Swiss-Prot record:
Alphabetized Pfam families for the sequence: Complex1_30kDa (PF00329)
Membrane topology recorded in Swiss-Prot or TrEMBL: Peripheral membrane protein
Subunit and partners: NDH is composed of at least 16 different subunits, 5 of which are encoded in the nucleus.
Protein name: NAD(P)H-quinone oxidoreductase subunit J, chloroplastic
Length: 158
């Protein structure tokens, strides 16, 4: 079943795949990485003027990485603002997604955190560098195949 945003994207011939709705009724749309800049601008023009959150996660060990954007259409006197969830899957061998910092400035720290923890490179981001981990850190801590360096398990003496 297509939601309002998916219908609108189809009318404007923007490539996407409807993925249903979450438990709150928020429409989920999956897109390809290369289509993200044009779809982001189109959604901003459509009225999604607020990036509520952005996150990244490892779908499964050895599988895809996902970057998820939650967009909200803020309007005056709106009790129930319209929301949409955009999901982008990328390969872990070359995890690259165009940054949407230039559309929603609030993506700055959120994309940096996703880069720092999951290793997704947000192309054309103005300050893409580690934000939580030291610059010397090796690897991406939130990937399911990550091995903590120099980890020693403490055992009970009893």
């Amino acid at each position: 079943m297509q939601g309002r945003v998916s219908v609108w994207l189809s009318q404007h011939k923007l490539a996407h795949r409807p993925s249903g709705f979450d438990y709150q009724g928020i429409e989920i749309i999956q897109i390809k990485s290369e289509d993200w800049p044009s779809i982001a601008v189109a959604l901003y023009i459509y009225g999604f003027n607020y990036l509520r959150s952005q996150c990244a996660y490892d779908v499964m060990p050895g599988g895809f990485l996902a970057s998820v954007y939650h967009l909200t259409k803020l309007q005056d006197n709106a009790d129930q603002p319209e929301e949409v969830c955009i999901k982008i899957l990328v390969s872990r061998e070359s995890p690259k997604i165009p940054s949407i910092f230039w559309v929603w400035k609030s993506a700055d720290f959120q994309e940096r955190e996703s880069y720092d923890m999951s290793g997704i490179h947000y192309e054309s981001h103005p300050r893409l560098k580690r934000i939580l981990m030291p610059e010397s850190w090796i690897g991406w801590p939130l990937r399911k195949d990550y091995v903590v360096p120099n980890f020693y398990e403490l055992q009970d003496a009893y």
